[in-house]
């Protein structure tokens, strides 16, 4: 019987072989054909197109559009951008540690990093950069200025700056250092029992930084912890696995990857002894939490190891691998999808069903599949991680949004910082009434204009009324509504004073105490953090949410 089965199997294999060979041959022929057509097309363009063609620019445009048709993450990286990839992987570069922006022809500092040569030399947010190493910056692009400020560690840089509102003109002599972006931006105790760790990246060393923060907090007496991954775009897969391993036993499978090539089919498990497998954990996420952030949140949810709080995550469940190309260029391509312990894939079903910020739109349950966590709770695939407790995101009024967009908060904080040497510590600083009263005049001096959401809606209504021939009959009513909803700066500043004051206080604090200070100022007003503390303080509710 076995011999007959083997014979039948061999016959079937022999019959299928020509079909497999033909399919492979057709595929190879199609590739060869298309490459030949492309080469012929480029030759004709070079010979006969009416204007001179930059071959590098043309080919780059073609490559970018070709890869864009696959997914948003498969990218061609020319030699000139290799440093960007190294920065994304290591979080390190040689430079002075300052971000810059541009208004018209003016280059200005948006943020000097805490502890960087820029910060130690006295460079401030809002400072106008006039020269770098004696060379004027006017009319040049920010990317060019940024590259000029980067360089070999230990080499000098001279900046000539102008300080707004104070009239100072300064020459700062700096020495480039290794700039390392921390993955743990901030950590502290929230209550006597609850710690807080904000993780903003997954570059090399992220898991070590989280371990060190957790151990320090445990020494301070915490018995629960909040992990904040909001706004974290992800990074290295292994760092995500190691962060999970801090809270999960050795040997636990964390994630599997599945790709077309056998080499991309793999399983990643916890390899070390954990720090604490019992400490209650709350994981904070939002629509900008992506990739490695989603692995950590998803695994903690699948294993019922922590409560997830916030908004649905971005929905990026793809693995990218960097491959070497000719002339030192590289290709960052999608090689696999990752799957977490329940068996679900976090990747959004398609790239078109997304909101303007890139996050996942509404996906009907009929298009997704149901999975179960370790404790039997129901979870779904196809669109990021849905939190156990959903919190509405912080939103701003049209007035405050326009103030952010036009950098009015930034400029007001710049003026305040350059006229005031010190303020109270983060969490204790509050905007004084005299400072608030300066704001309307400041906005008017800066020619600030805005339109309320109601005004925008009314304008659209007017166009519809006009197109349908109703405007003449309703003109009086429309004008009455317009008088009510039109922006009145003094009125609207008072109406939205609480939120505007909060944003101003956060921006001003960051000028004295940097991003760690901003975090300490933000925390008392953060509803998502408050909810996490509430849940972690109630063991019965915490365990109920985990299905235990």
Please provide the spans of the model-predicted regions:
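Hydrophobic membrane-insertion alpha-helices, especially the h-region
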Residues: 7-22
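Short linear motifs in exposed loops
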Residues: 111, 140, 173, 334, ...
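Cleft-lining beta-strand/loop regions that shape enzyme active-site pockets
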Residues: 22-34, 38, 42-55, 78, ...
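Polar, glycine-rich mid-to-C-terminal structural blocks
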Residues: 292, 304, 311, 315-377, ...
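Positively charged n-region of N-terminal signal peptides that target proteins for export
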Residues: 1-6
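Conserved functional hotspot residues or short segments at active or partner-binding sites
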Residues: 345-352, 356-548
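Extended, small/polar residue-biased N-terminal targeting/export presequences
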Residues: 49-110, 154-176, 181-186, 523-528, ...
